[in-house]
């Protein structure tokens, strides 16, 4: 009887968590990279959208094997007649060599802003990203970038 009484609040809490949805998040998806990102692996996300103004961000999950304190990314967004290509530079550390998104575990989640207040049209939106990190004395990107576990894309309604 006591066990049944304990299950009821647990089940209610679980139902509440599952039913909660952040109305500002229009799209969220991750792709697992199994700990390394090859330079030829262009990650692609496709989502349907209605006309709106959005904020687009990447979420990188890294571990202690990631050898750099920054990352360079090349992204492209195709929506309607728009096709925008950008280079993104992101520093994981501040001037004091502290990670911006430091966490207790060895896995770090970093949210990288790609576009703020971006107007998308109704229809299919295609987003692609690849890494372009290289050593200082090289013009070629790293063949394999260790320590990258997952790459995610989050599209949220803009506050403006």
Please place each PLM-identified region on the residue numbering.
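Bacterial N-terminal signal peptides that target proteins for export
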Residues: 1-8
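Start-of-domain marker
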Residues: 23-86
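Short acidic/polar inter-strand loop motif in beta-rich domains
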Residues: 63-65, 108-121, 131-140
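A beta-strand/beta-hairpin structural motif
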Residues: 90-93, 100-116
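Beta-strand elements of well-folded, non-transmembrane domains
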Residues: 60-64, 77-79, 92-94, 131-135, ...
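Internal, hydrophobic beta-strand segments that form the core of beta-sheet-rich folds
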Residues: 121-157
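C-terminal motif of bacterial Sec signal peptides marking the signal peptidase cleavage site
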Residues: 16-19
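Extended extracellular/luminal ectodomain segments enriched in beta-structured repeat modules
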Residues: 49-56, 122-123, 157-159
């Amino acid at each position: 009887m006591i066990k049944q009484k304990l299950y009821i609040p647990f089940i209610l809490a679980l139902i509440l968590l599952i039913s909660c949805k952040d109305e500002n998040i229009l799209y969220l998806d991750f792709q697992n990279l199994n700990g390394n990102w090859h330079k030829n692996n262009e990650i692609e996300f496709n989502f349907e959208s209605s006309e709106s103004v959005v904020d687009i961000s990447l979420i990188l999950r890294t571990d202690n094997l990631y050898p750099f304190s920054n990352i360079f990314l090349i992204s492209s967004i195709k929506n309607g007649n728009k096709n925008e290509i950008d280079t993104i530079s992101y520093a994981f550390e501040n001037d004091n060599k502290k990670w911006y998104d430091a966490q207790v575990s060895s896995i770090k989640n970093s949210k990288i802003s790609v576009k703020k207040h971006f107007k998308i049209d109704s229809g299919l939106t295609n987003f692609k990203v690849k890494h372009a990190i290289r050593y200082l004395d090289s013009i070629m990107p790293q063949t394999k970038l260790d320590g990258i576990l997952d790459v995610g894309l989050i599209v949220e309604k803009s506050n403006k």
